[in-house]
Amino acid sequence: MLEPKRTKYRRPHKVSYEGKAKGNKYVAFGEFGLMATNGAWISNRQIESARIAISKALGKTGKMWIRIFPHLSLTKKPLEVRMGSGKGSPEKWVAVVKAGTVMFEVANIPEEVARTALKNAGNKLSVNWKIVKKGEIAHD
């Protein structure tokens, strides 16, 4: 699972996923990419299951890039605990994905295989998505 080795603060403020992405908007490394069309938090478990789905379809010649990383820790208080007395303990790590962010990229495989691999990966994520080509500007 992906998670940071060290963080400056254990329990950060919540980061909003509203609005459009500023960076990470184009396919930079591969030939095809999986782009988010709305914002959401993507957990490290979702990223891992999408990675496995892509790597099953890639084979030995294909290459994959994961362009998101779960930097944000989400906290939760235990069940049946009264309000107050501080913030809860960190429960899971999430990546903040805004609309227009390219999350995964693949290369060195035929287009049909790339589309099925990215489709299988997209179905594992809690965000709406579309498949984009390198050099293609995706308008919302």
From Swiss-Prot:
Q: Does the keyword tRNA-binding apply?
A: yes
Please name the InterPro entries in this protein's record: Ribosomal_uL16, Ribosomal_uL16_bact-type, Ribosomal_uL16_CS, Ribosomal_uL16_dom, Ribosomal_uL16_sf
Domain of life according to the entry: Bacteria
Keyword annotations from UniProtKB, A to Z: Ribonucleoprotein, Ribosomal protein, RNA-binding, rRNA-binding, tRNA-binding
Q: Which GO terms describe its biological process?
A: translation
- Alphabetized GO MF terms: rRNA binding; structural constituent of ribosome; tRNA binding
Q: Which terms in the GO cellular component ontology are assigned?
A: cytosolic large ribosomal subunit
Note the CDD domains from the entry.
Ribosomal_L16_L10e
- One matching Pfam family is Ribosomal_L16
Q: Between which residues do disulfide bridges form? A: none
Q: How does it assemble?
A: Part of the 50S ribosomal subunit.
Q: Which family does it belong to?
A: Belongs to the universal ribosomal protein uL16 family.
NCBIfam families, per the entry: rplP_bact
Role description: Binds 23S rRNA and is also seen to make contacts with the A and possibly P site tRNAs.
Q: What is this protein called?
A: Large ribosomal subunit protein uL16
